[in-house]
Amino acid sequence: QRLLDGLRERGAKATFFLCGYRMEQYPDAMERYLEEGHELGVHSTVHTDLTKLTPEQLREDMAGTAQMIEEMTGIWPVLMRPPGGAYDEKVLREAEQEGMRVILWSVDPRDWATHDARQVLSTMAREAGDGDVILMHDMSKSSVDAALRLIDELQEKGFCFVTVSELAERKGVSMTAGSVYEDFKEK
């Protein structure tokens, strides 16, 4: 809740890629994500390497997670992020069949590997720029601290924080299902 409170206070938006088991743990957050203008996407059911699944297991995982999101919010997600960024042709085909765009990242502060908010913030502040997609996790206090401090620093420099779909639209990128996007920088 602290992350959502901080985003709201700063007028910042985010895209949250959700695991099924986490949605079950925090059902109240689902409605709040949408009420406050955030975007939701599929991560997986239990955070597994999607490339290791059979086509049937993959379909069950992706469609099942999407269905959970739809049942809780009324919206079918059009974005997905494979755990660890691991994807192959099978994952891309399934994403296309489910109508999902595959979103990776261009800045990874490795917040999942450390509990040092200063280190995470330093990496993000050094690497983040216009059109970047920043990978972060909302499961630790240090990640939330770093995210909110980064938003403060970059907003002071004129940056704004928007959802992935809004970023693509602002940059004139028409995303297509089954395609992979790491950033939306001017090429």
Predicted segment positions?
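Active-site-proximal beta-strand/loop segments in catalytic clefts of secreted hydrolases
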Residues: 17-21, 44-45, 81-85, 105-108, ...
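Active-site beta->alpha N-cap acidic-glycine motif
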Residues: 1-53, 57-75, 160, 169
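A broadly tuned preference for mixed-charge, low-complexity surface segments
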Residues: 45-48, 63-69, 133-140, 152-161, ...
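Structural recognition of alpha->loop->beta junctions
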Residues: 35-39, 73-76, 128, 178-187
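Conserved, mostly hydrophobic/aromatic
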Residues: 7, 16, 40-43, 65, ...
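C-terminal domain-boundary segment and adjacent tail
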Residues: 5-14, 24, 142-187
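Alpha-helical scaffold elements lining the catalytic groove of polysaccharide deacetylases
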Residues: 1-2, 26, 48-76, 84-130, ...
